[in-house]
Amino acid sequence: LHRLSVLILLLLLLPDWVAAGSFSLVSVPYYNLEGYPLTSCVSMVLEYFGAKFNLEDLRSKISPLGWDDLASAITYLENKGYRVYITQLQIREIKNLLNYSEIPVIVGQSFRKPYDYLYWRLVIGFDDERGLVTNDPMIRNNYILDEEKFKSLWVREAPGITIVIVPKDKRLSISENSTVKNALLFYSNTRRFVYNSDWKSAKSEIEKYLKIYPDNPMGLNTYAYILLQLGDLENARKTIERVIPQYPLPYICNTAGLVYWKLNDIKTAGQYFSRAYTSSPSNKEIVKNYANFLASQNNIEDARDVLSSYLVLEPEDKEIKDLLDKLNNSK
């Protein structure tokens, strides 16, 4: 019934993207909890299945430390009576789930380009002429990605990372991929240990992750940062140099800046901080690190400019305002 009502509406309205070709679409409500793409996708799926929930309560359960946490999401869903499949699917398998079972599918991708950061989209339909129809938590509902673009963003730790959520009494002919699930949970654990500054435990978890995906740039970057915090500067340098030639992404350049700054290679550190900031001037961590680096080199005016530019975008950010006030009051 979900799909039938939508198809009738589509036929009446005749939107451009349904003009030709095979298509399917399920009627899924749209939510955008800013900064919480996984929580947003889970809320859409739950409401699709008729569950009652408080959105803020859901956010606090799935994102207890301020970011989407997969382990917390699995626990929450299983306690609510849902089965969670973490697996790898191909596009044709997603189409089959939509077309024959009317089940929306959460995919773990990058946001705009491979390996920028883990981002979750909800696939709600497809049009063979134009691509996959998604409820994108950051962009909009009914956001279409052509299949080639979709696949290019779907490479991450492993190609085809997928979360399928269904009521426990509904069984599907798909199997969970324990390798993918374990890797994602190892990384989730790593983030929690980093948050609590438990660097030895963080190192243990990220090493488990890297045994599964030894060349993953996100994992290597995190490993370099943890080694830096543990004072293992030489291995931190070797790790970041292993990943940055192929993936000079802003967050990796930022970590490289921190490593070389600690090694007192000021010239190289400045180059990497500058690259990170130029590519991502709205990233708070990059802004803080670059401003602190500039201030440490007595480039006070440049540091002020970096912080002031960020405050144009986020005028109420107290931490950045305090940093700027500290610089303004310095002699």
Describe the residue ranges of each PLM region.
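Cysteine-nucleophile protease catalytic domains, especially the papain-like/related folds used
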Residues: 20-96, 100, 111, 161, ...
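Noncatalytic regulatory segments and standalone regulatory/sensor domains
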Residues: 128-221, 225-228
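TPR alpha-solenoid repeat register
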Residues: 219, 252-253, 286, 320
